[in-house]
């Protein structure tokens, strides 16, 4: 919100350095500003699409490869951003609104897949697959994660959550 390109570069470089030291950053969300009525910034302009594209490119170039670059698929065409380095489309809910941007409906998963063409969608848990595989989660949710994740750390196909997974 009002950062310059240099500010974004500095922030991304700081995040990258922290991740290289600690290995704990799952994702960086690049989200365009959308002014909201009744707020102090209601009359501020949204950033140009080109600025979002540039921010995604910067993130993809600066961040380590194991840090996901995420955008919300309901705010801007995700296919064009995937071409610039987006690796994650975040959460899409058929049950709830986008609480941050309630004016922007979540896309229907089937419609989104059609838009993306040969780019596959793959459901994951809130804990990213590498962290699932490393066991980087609380013991309190361990059984749930083991029940819901496959051998790759992604979400099991719906309906198979209770199936035995011999490799776990």
Residue ranges and their predicted role:
Residues 2-4:
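Short, glycine-rich nucleotide/cofactor-binding loops
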Residues 9-168:
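Auxiliary Fe-S-binding modules of radical SAM enzymes
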């Amino acid at each position: 919100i009002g950062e310059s390109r240099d500010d974004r570069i500095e922030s991304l470089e700081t995040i990258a350095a922290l991740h290289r030291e600690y290995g704990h950053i799952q994702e960086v969300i690049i989200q365009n500003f959308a002014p909201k009525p009744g707020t102090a910034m209601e009359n501020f302009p949204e950033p140009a699409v080109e600025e979002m594209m540039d921010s995604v490119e910067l993130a993809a170039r600066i961040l380590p490869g194991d840090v996901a670059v995420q955008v919300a698929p309901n705010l801007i065409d995700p296919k064009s951003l995937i071409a610039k380095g987006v690796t994650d489309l975040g959460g899409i809910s058929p049950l709830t609104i986008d609480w941050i941007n309630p004016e922007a409906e979540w896309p229907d998963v089937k419609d989104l897949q059609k838009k993306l063409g040969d780019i596959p969608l793959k459901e994951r848990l809130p804990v990213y697959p590498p962290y699932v595989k490393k066991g980087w989660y609380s013991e309190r949710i361990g059984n749930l994660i083991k029940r819901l994740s496959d051998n790759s750390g992604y979400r099991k196909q719906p309906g198979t959550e209770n199936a035995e997974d011999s490799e776990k």
